[in-house]
Regions:
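Conserved alpha-helix/loop element of class I SAM-dependent methyltransferases that forms part
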Residues: 96, 100-135
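Conserved class I S-adenosyl-L-methionine
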Residues: 134-144, 160
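Conserved SAM/SAH-binding beta-strand->alpha-helix loop
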Residues: 165
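S-adenosyl-L-methionine
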Residues: 174-212
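Conserved Class I S-adenosyl-L-methionine
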Residues: 267-305
Length: 335
C-alpha cells in the first residue's frame, strides 16, 4: 500500500539498494505531502507536526542525518508554535531595520514609514562625527540584525556588532556576505510572506555572538560605543553602562537609545535606572554625568538628547506597536 501511494523524491543515502535516508512524495500531485526515510524506516504520517513534537527529544538520529533530512525536520520545527513565534519575532526586527528597502505592503495610517525612517535618520545623525572626521573603531552592543552597524560603517574604519541572539546575528552576517535582503514577514496566524529588497551593505564590519555584559574586548578599544534598545533588555542595566564606559577611549562617544520597557522577567525592579521621584531619562543623564551613583566613576558630558523619539514594531498585518525612545549622546571625559 505504501508503494502504491508514495514515490521516491530524493535519495540521500542507500545501502545494497535499500533506502536509508530519503524523502518520499505523495504519488497524487494534489496531496503535496512529503515523508522522510530515516535509518531505513519510512515515516508516513498525516499529522507529522504532532508526531515530531512528541518524538524530537529522543530522535537523536536527525542530528547526524544528511542535510536534506535535517532541513525537513527543521521545517517541522518552524511550523510548530515555538517556530511560528521565533520566525515572527525575527521578521519583526528585520522589518524594523530594513523595511524601507523591501518591496512589501506598507503600514496603514497612522503607522507611516516616515516614523521609522525618522528614527534611523535621528540616531545616524547623532552618531555622525564632525565634518571630515571618521571613527577608527566603533561598536554596537546588542546589534540585532545589524542596521546600525552598517550605518556606522559609512564613517568608521571598522565596526563590530555583537548580540546574544544567533539568528539575528546570522541575518546581519548573511546580508553582509551575500548582499541580499530576503526575509519572512508574518501576515497573520501561520501565514508568512517572503519579501525581498535591495540593500548594499558596507563590508568593513564584523558580527559576533557575544554578551554585552561581558564583551570580549580590552578596555579603551573603541572611539564610539552604541547600544540601541538594549538598556531595558539586560539583567543589570548599570553593568551595561559600565561596560560601555570601559570600552570607550578617553574622549570617545557613547550613544544610547531606550524606551525604558522595564520587565521583571529580565531585570529585578531594584536594577531599573529610576527612582520613585526621578524619572528614567533624568536619572540616566545624572548617572552619566556623575550626579547619581557617583561611585561608578562615570564622567560623561551629554552633548545631545531627545526624550521621545518614536519607532514602530510590526508584529503582523494587524498588530503594530509604537515606542518612544530616549536617545542620548555623551562624550567621555579625558583623564
Amino acid at each position: 500500500m505504501i508503494q502504491a501511494s508514495v514515490e521516491v523524491s530524493k535519495v540521500y543515502r542507500e545501502e545494497g539498494g535499500e533506502l536509508l535516508e530519503a524523502l518520499l512524495a505523495c504519488a497524487d500531485s494534489r496531496c503535496g505531502a512529503t515523508y522522510p526515510v530515516l535509518n531505513g524506516v519510512p515515516i508516513v504520517l498525516k499529522d507529522m507536526d504532532s508526531w515530531w513534537r512528541q518524538s524530537k527529544p529522543s530522535l537523536s538520529s536527525v542530528r547526524s542525518a544528511a542535510p536534506g533530512i535535517r532541513d525537513f525536520f527543521d521545517g517541522l520545527e518552524a511550523r510548530g508554535a515555538a517556530g511560528i513565534v521565533a520566525r515572527s519575532l525575527l521578521g519583526t526586527y528585520v522589518d524594523f531595520h530594513y523595511g524601507k528597502f523591501v518591496d512589501a505592503p506598507r503600514p496603514p495610517a497612522p503607522f507611516s514609514d516616515a516614523v521609522n525612517d525618522s528614527y534611523w535618520e535621528k540616531i545616524v545623525g547623532m552618531a555622525r562625527p564632525e565634518s571630515g572626521m571618521r571613527y577608527g573603531r566603533s561598536l554596537d552592543l546588542g546589534c540585532s540584525v545589524g542596521r546600525f552597524v552598517f550605518e556606522l560603517a559609512r564613517f568608521s574604519g571598522l565596526v563590530v556588532g555583537i548580540d546574544l541572539d544567533f539568528e539575528k546575528v546570522s541575518v546581519a552576517a548573511r546580508l553582509r556576505r551575500r548582499r541580499e535582503l530576503v526575509f519572512e514577514r508574518r501576515e497573520l496566524g501561520k501565514a508568512f510572506r517572503c519579501v525581498e529588497g535591495a540593500f548594499d551593505p558596507p563590508q568593513n564590519v564584523l558580527f559576533l555572538v557575544g554578551d554585552a555584559l561581558d564583551p570580549p574586548f580590552p578596555a579603551g578599544s573603541f572611539d564610539l560605543v552604541g547600544a540601541l534598545n538594549l538598556l531595558d533588555n539586560v539583567g543589570v542595566p548599570l553593568m551595561l553602562l559600565g561596560q560601555m564606559d570601559a570600552l570607550l577611549r578617553d574622549g570617545g562617544t557613547m550613544l544610547l537609545g531606550t524606551p525604558y520597557e522595564w520587565r521583571t522577567e529580565i531585570a529585578d525592579p531594584a536594577e531599573w535606572l529610576e527612582t520613585e521621584t526621578v524619572d528614567a531619562p533624568s536619572f540616566l543623564r545624572r548617572v552619566l554625568e556623575g550626579k547619581e551613583l557617583a561611585l561608578t566613576g562615570f564622567r560623561f558630558t551629554v552633548e545631545e538628547e531627545h526624550t521621545e523619539v518614536p519607532w514602530i514594531l510590526r508584529g503582523h498585518a494587524r498588530r503594530w506597536t509604537l515606542f518612544l525612545s530616549h536617545m542620548i549622546k555623551a562624550r567621555k571625559a579625558v583623564s
